[in-house]
Design a protein with these regions (language model features):
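Solvent-exposed loop/turn and edge beta-strand elements of beta-rich ligand-binding domains
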Residues: 1-153
């Protein structure tokens, strides 16, 4: 009887134990390379902030290692930054912004004006890691801090 109770208890535990799901990351569609975009929306207290300009720099290329996509620094900055441990880091964005003169400006993105709706659009982008820097602030506002964003992620 004791063995039977232990067996029933073990079966109940296995049935109640939640299954573990493993999800693979979505593989970027190579056909979209060169056809991606970044839209930056400037809003303060729920209202669009127009004016000012943004510049976009490509700081990383997408590469694959052990089946995982990652960002590797562009050639212009490989001597200063060998890898991107945390591509979402504010500190990394600040460091890259301080190296702005070395960074390749994205074609047609050296000075994109922020429109009346508070948006700036960077289009026809290749896969990679990008640094967004505000060159001029909207009248009455300060510049936003530089930030990093990945395409297509």
């Amino acid at each position: 009887m004791k063995k039977y109770l232990i067996s029933v208890l073990m079966v109940c535990c296995l049935l109640l134990y939640p299954s573990v799901s493993v999800l693979a990351h979505e593989i970027p569609d190579p056909a979209k390379n060169g056809h991606c975009s970044i839209t930056v929306q400037m809003v303060y207290e729920g209202k669009a902030v127009s004016g000012g300009s943004l510049t976009l720099y490509k700081v990383g290329e997408v590469s694959e290692k052990d089946g995982n996509d990652r960002f590797t620094p562009v050639d212009e900055i490989k001597d200063e930054i060998s890898s991107f441990e945390d591509p979402g880091s504010a500190e990394l964005a600040e460091k890259l912004a301080s190296m702005e003169k070395k960074l390749p400006v994205v074609k047609n993105a050296s000075s994109v004006e922020i429109g009346a709706d508070g948006t700036a659009l960077f289009s026809d982008l290749e896969f990679g890691l990008y640094l967004v820097v505000q060159k001029t602030a909207a009248p009455g506002y300060e510049k936003i801090l530089p930030f990093l964003t990945g395409v297509p992620y």
